[in-house]
């Protein structure tokens, strides 16, 4: 028993690293970065005003081959309700993930015990590689109300990105997240305004969405989808350094 008291338990991730997967951009997005940049693309954030996933986002998800899977954390309850689900996709559609704390708890479980986390997604066959994780939509997350509101939620986003980075290192999966553009928050009855009061010291918004700049700066590429004359157009907000 004395021997057991001195035994230390270490996470498996301390000893195992996975081969990294990279995001394959669909044709309509490939003109935004060079081939060399695309070959290093692990973190992508998409800003678009549609509730439903755009065609480009669906193409990004529908890129699995063989024994690969993509985990879709369906905060908006859109993906899992589609009549034709994405091939090779696993869906996490739980009330526990509609607040940022619950989302972080689930992702930490995915890091510490992937099989236990995936069982919550009704997965019973684990003979596959997790190619990527999609989180749609960060703008719908509920946040804690407190006198230190801004500090709390900013720190939660920093924690969110930290666990996403750890998952990429451990599982090799790429990360795609989505949010609404800034002007969308002033939409119907201003329903999304109050909870998005994270202040910036400079008073200047660096990105056309109301996520913390510290989170956005962690992305390899940020794409902004606009509709001009009835047609979708994509432009790059940030990309990998040359």
Swiss-Prot record:
- InterPro entries reported in the protein's UniProt record: P-loop_NTPase, Psy3
- Transmembrane regions listed in the UniProt entry: none
Q: Which domain of life is it from?
A: Eukaryota
Where does the record say this protein resides?
Nucleus
Question: Do the record's keywords include Phosphoprotein?
Answer: no
Q: Which Gene3D superfamilies match?
A: P-loop containing nucleotide triphosphate hydrolases
Q: What keywords are annotated for this sequence in UniProt? A: DNA damage, DNA repair, Nucleus
Q: Which GO terms describe its biological process?
A: DNA recombinase assembly; error-free postreplication DNA repair; error-free translesion synthesis; positive regulation of single-strand break repair via homologous recombination; recombinational repair
Q: Which GO terms describe its cellular component?
A: cytoplasm; cytosol; nucleus; Shu complex; site of double-strand break
Role description: Required for resistance to the DNA-damaging agents methyl methanesulfonate (MMS), cisplatin and oxaliplatin, but not to mitomycin C. Plays a role in protection against mutation accumulation. May be a component of the recombination-repair pathway.
The annotated subunit structure for this chain is: Component of the SHU complex composed of at least CSM2, PSY3, SHU1 and SHU2.
Q: What else is known?
A: Present with 876 molecules/cell in log phase SD medium.
Q: What is this protein called?
A: Platinum sensitivity protein 3
